[in-house]
C-alpha cells in the first residue's frame, strides 16, 4: 500500500515540481535584475548629473560632485548588501520546502491510519 500510494503521489508531484522549478527560475531572474536596478538607479542619476555639472563648471563643482554621490551611495550600498544575500536565500529554501511539506504529511498520515486501527481493534 505504501509503495503504491507513494509512486502515485510522486507522479502527481512530478508535474507540480516541474512547474515549481520553472516558476522559481523566472522569480530568481526577476530578483537578479532587481538587484542591479537598485545600484543602477543611483548610477543613471549620477551620469546625468555629472555631464550637467561638468558642463556648468568643472573646477568649483568637482568637490561637491564626489561628496553628493558618496553620501547617497553609502546608505544604498549598505541595504543592498544585506538584501542581496537575503534575496537568494529565500528562493533556495523555497524549492526544498514545497516537496517536504507534501511529503511530511503523507508518511505520517499513512502510519497514523494503521496505528489508530491497531489499538482500536
Swiss-Prot record:
GO terms for molecular function: structural constituent of tooth enamel. Residues 59-71 have a biased composition (Low complexity). Residues 85-111 have a biased composition (Pro residues). One of its GO terms (biological process) is enamel mineralization. Its main location: secreted. The keyword GTP-binding does not apply. GO terms for cellular component: collagen-containing extracellular matrix; extracellular region. Keywords: Biomineralization, Extracellular matrix, Repeat, Secreted. Residues 48-58 have a biased composition (Polar residues). Plays a role in the biomineralization of teeth. Seems to regulate the formation of crystallites during the secretory stage of tooth enamel development. Thought to play a major role in the structural organization and mineralization of developing enamel. Belongs to the amelogenin family. This is Amelogenin. It comes from Ornithorhynchus anatinus.
Amino acid at each position: 500500500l505504501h509503495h503504491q500510494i507513494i509512486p502515485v503521489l510522486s507522479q502527481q508531484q512530478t508535474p507540480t515540481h516541474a512547474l515549481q522549478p520553472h516558476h522559481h527560475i523566472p522569480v530568481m531572474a526577476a530578483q537578479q535584475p532587481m538587484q542591479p536596478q537598485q545600484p543602477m538607479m543611483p548610477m543613471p542619476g549620477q551620469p546625468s548629473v555629472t555631464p550637467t555639472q561638468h558642463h556648468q563648471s568643472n573646477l568649483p563643482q568637482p568637490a561637491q560632485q564626489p561628496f553628493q554621490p558618496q553620501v547617497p551611495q553609502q546608505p544604498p550600498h549598505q541595504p543592498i548588501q544585506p538584501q542581496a544575500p537575503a534575496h537568494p536565500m529565500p528562493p533556495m529554501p523555497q524549492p526544498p520546502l514545497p516537496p517536504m511539506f507534501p511529503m511530511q504529511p503523507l508518511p505520517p498520515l499513512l502510519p497514523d491510519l494503521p496505528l489508530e486501527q491497531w489499538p482500536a481493534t
